[in-house]
Each structure stands twice: as C-alpha cells, then as structure tokens.
Amino acid sequence: MFEIKNLSIQIHNQYFIRNLSLTLNAGDKLAIIGEEGNGKSTLLKVILGICPYAEVEGTIFSKNHSIGYLPQMLESNDLQKTGYEYLFKSLEDYYNQVNFLYQNLERLHIDDSLLERTLSCMSGGEKVKLSILKLLLEKPDILFLDEPTNDLDIETLEWLEHFIVETKCPVVYVSHDETLLSHTANCILHLERIYRKTECKHTFYRTTYDDYVRMRRESLAKETMIAKQEQRDYQKREEKLRQVMQKVEYQQNTISRSNPHGGRLLKKKMHSLKSQERKLHDTNLAKVPDVEEGISFRFENVTIPRFKKILTIDIPTFQVDTRVLATNLHLEVMGNEKVCIIGSNGIGKSTFLKTIYETLRNRSDIRVGYMPQNYEDAWDENQSVLEFLSSIGNKEEMQKAMTYLGNMKFTVEEMNGSIRNLSGGSKAKLLLTRFVLEKVDVLLLDEPTRNVSPLSNPVIRDVLRKFQGTIISVSHDRKYISEVATRVYRFTKNGLVLER
C-alpha cells in the first residue's frame, strides 16, 4: 500500500536518513521516535513532497492513495480563518458533510460554538482537535500525523488512541507520548544520531513500542557484554604475545656468537611472533554499541521547608477580557508538594498557571522557574542559547552551563546558535537547564514533557519526582501525572476539583 526504497535525506551536507527501506500495509501503525532534531518531521515532509530544503534520493510509492497530513504547526494564513472556513471550502461542502461533522464534534468533545471563532483565538489543544476533525472529513487512505497528542486533553487522547487502533488505513505518526505509543504502535522506526551527532542511524521493527524498548535494552546489554569480553580476551592475548616476544628478544641479545644455528632459530621464531602480532592487530573486535541515549541532569542543593506556605490564591471570578473562565478558584500549596492541574482544552489552565506566576515572581523568599506553554514568551528568539544563559554568572558558571547543555545533548553548534532554530524539545530542555543553574525551588511548568522524546521523558519524570522543591504544573501526560504529581486537580468552570 505504501513503500519506501533506499531513501536518503540530506540537509546542508548532513545526512539525517541513509538507505531507509520499508513497506506499510493496511492496518499498520508506524510510530517514528527519536531525540529532537533527528529528522522525524523532516521525514514526514519528504514523504509528502513538502520539504524543498532537503536533498532526497530514493523512491516513495503510495499507489495513488489519498494522503491526510496533520502538521505540527498550522500555516499562518489558516490562523486567520474561523473553524468553519478552515474545515470547509464552500457552503456546499458543509451541507454535504453536516451529519458527519456533528457526529465527530461529539466524539472529539468539541462544542460547535468553537467553529465560529478564529483559529488564532483557540488554545493549542483546540487547534489540534480541529485539525484532526479536518482529516476525518477528508477521509484519506493513509494518515501522517506529526505530534498529534500535543496539547490534547486526556479525554481526547484516549479517543485518539482508540481511533488509531481501530482505523483500517495505515497511520504514520511522530509522537513523544509513551502511553499512546504503548497502546497503538505495531511498527517502530527509531531515528538516531550517533558518534556525537556526526552519523545517522535508523532501526525498523514490526513490533509494539514496549517490546521494542525491551528488545533494544536487552540487545544493547548483550552487544556491550560481548564487546567487552572480546576486548578482555584481546588484551590477554596481546599481553601473552608481548611477554613471549620479550623473552625471545632477550635470548637473541644474549645468545653466544658461537651458536649461529640457535641464533637463526630465534630469528625465525621472532619473525613468526611478529606475524602473529600483525594478525592480532588486524582482528575485527566487536564494538561497544554507540547509541543515542536520553538526557542527564539533576537539581543540586535545592530544598524548601515542607510546611512553608508557597501559594494561597482565591479568585472569585477568573476571566480574560469579558470571557469568564471559572468561578471560585482556590488553591493552597505547601513546600515539597507537586500539584498537577488537568482539564479540557481551552478551559483556562495555562492562563491560571500564568496568573500563579505573576503572583509569585517577585517573592524574595523563593526562586521561581516558569515554563510557559509558548516557549517564545520566555526569551528573545534571536538570542543564542549561551546568551540566554549568560545572565546567570561568571565564566566559571558559563562553563558549568556548557557542561549541563552537553548533558542535555546540545551540540556546540546548537549552544552557539539561535534559539529560534531549536526544536520544541530542545527549547524545553534549555529552560530546564536554566532552572538547574539558577537553583530554583518553585517550578511552574506548562506541559513540561510535551515535546521531549520518549527516551528522555523518563529522565525528566524521575528528576522532577525527586525534586525537593515545589512543582505546580499543567499536564495531559498520563505517565507524568501518575509518577510525579502528589495532588491532581481538575480545572472546571466552577473551580478546582481534587481528583487525587
């Protein structure tokens, strides 16, 4: 149904994919995984023929099947359209699909009043829902989804999982949501950049995500064990040969000139030993596998008293302009608590978190780190990565910053490059790096795991779970909520409802 043969993708003389071949059939659900900047979105764009900046070799066959594409970001001209204008080219299109439209509005938990608003006024999750709805109306033969779970509320995430599993057409998707990957994928394409990001590598398996992670872990452990054993055996043989050669060399130096026959035998033996040495040095030893692993970081010396009152907020009427988002909002947070706020898309969670930030930012007794939903609100996009961190301290601190950035898998080029060029996941990791360097003790995080790879997300969850300060976050990541949050509130129009 869909086939790729010997596909290679190169950008600025750097390969992101080399000689990729795979075939997809009806019912295949291919998840593309990997660290940020490894070419996952680029691969989708190349397949769709919308990546003019890439040099491409190889062939792509889709046998005239219609293709549906959910991009990571909407086109700027689409943002000025109303929901109706975005979904339908004409009034006739609307009337032809009105029944199908309202069936799916209900399935996606979309209020039809949303269609009257312009996309620029919608939340991130509302835009994603509308984009998915547009795909459903188009009824394509093959679906390509780039980060479909970004900003979606939990109810819609569960619907999306069910849809991916049940649909008969092939679905190719990029995702960092481990729960969705575990529940939906039956094929895995893992894109990596190894040897300090100088070489690309891909791995394709027809298996589930959980089985792939397990097999990869076991395979790497076995390959590493074999390589280390071969290295030990090699060193033993090399040492034994060296000792024999030293002995023969000593005998050559001390043999009597009156024994030419013995000298010839020793010379012949040394010649044989050197031949053995050359063969030994030519041995192809198994190498310890070079793989792209997740990030590494931790908060050092950050503590906050358990009974310290961090936040008390009471808002009788919570509104933006004339739009009332909620009433009777009340929240108290103490030190060491990890509070997570969940709720439907567009209901006001991110706005509430920003309000909390404005309440806490000027407190002198705490150090607040804020990760907004739109990373651009945290910096000047034209700054370099190191310029963004330069206000932290002296040369020693900057060296420390570079070390932390290295642990976050930033290359030297990325450290010196513009923030604008970073992927969403790299921007999230940059903010986390700043929080570590500033030793913040109160974290306000809006979807902290949203753009980070499934290899790095477990690290982030573990670090935040062990964090000795306070966390107030908004998240739809089910693993994050389960593993990190100590209290979970649902944001409703009537206030915060304690769920756990």
Task: State where each predicted segment sits.
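ABC ATP-binding cassette signature C-motif
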Residues: 1-222, 303-500
